[in-house]
From Swiss-Prot:
Protein name according to UniProt: Thymidine kinase
Keyword Amino-acid biosynthesis attached: no
Major subcellular location class: cytoplasm
Compartments, record wording: Cytoplasm
Family the UniProt entry places it in: Belongs to the thymidine kinase family.
Organism name: Pyrobaculum aerophilum (strain ATCC 51768 / DSM 7523 / JCM 9630 / CIP 104966 / NBRC 100827 / IM2)
Assigned keywords, A-Z: ATP-binding, Cytoplasm, DNA synthesis, Kinase, Metal-binding, Nucleotide-binding, Transferase, Zinc
GO CC list: cytoplasm
Length: 185
């Protein structure tokens, strides 16, 4: 079974991933969690949520070698979880789909980048998923459900030509509803 958890930043994707993995561990299932090496915001060796919740993880490069590590190591476990899937190459979605035959696979990631465009790896994983859990955050400006991630530079929406990947937290990003999300110029 493949479960994909998506939404904007601050929606609780990592918290939900950890919650699900912990349930299986309590039930006696062997679980392994992976995270990309470039995600060092809160803890370099654990999957860490914005709210401080953490879980031990294997830190791997977000490249084809990392996908192979997930494929090989994951085959030895009952439950395989991968956080921040948007940072991995699109091949990860195929690996997760294959691993889901015979085990529980839980993946979490952003579905849209700061430009409002889909992350290819997340979109492909969603297509293969047995279940997609779409979470929303709370709009920083009005308090309504937020489905977008706004990148800010000095408090102003980042321009479209900014790098697609920029690791950060609430100092660089805000959750926004559709009404308050500003499409980058």
């Amino acid at each position: 079974m493949l479960v994909v958890i998506v939404g904007p930043m601050f929606a609780g994707k990592t918290t939900e991933l950890i919650r699900r993995v912990e349930r299986y561990v309590i039930a006696g299932r062997r679980a392994i969690v992976f995270k990309p090496s470039l995600d060092v915001r809160y803890d370099a060796s654990k999957v860490a949520a914005h709210n401080g919740l953490k879980f031990d993880a294997f830190v791997i490069p977000p490249d084809k070698d990392g996908v192979e590590i997930i494929r090989k190591m994951g085959a030895e476990y009952d439950v395989v979880a991968v956080d921040e899937i948007q940072f991995f190459p699109v091949d990860l979605a195929d690996a997760l789909n294959q691993l889901a035959n015979g085990r529980i696979v839980i993946a979490a990631g952003l579905n849209l980048d700061f430009r409002g465009e889909p992350f290819e790896t997340t979109a492909r994983a969603m297509a293969f998923a047995d279940r997609v859990i779409s979470l929303s955050a709370v709009c920083k400006l009005c308090g309504k459900p937020a489905t977008r991630t706004q990148r800010l530079i000095n408090g102003v929406p980042a321009p479209r030509h900014s790098p697609r990947i920029l690791i950060g937290g609430n100092e660089s990003y805000e959750a926004r509803c559709r009404r308050h999300y500003v499409i980058p110029p």
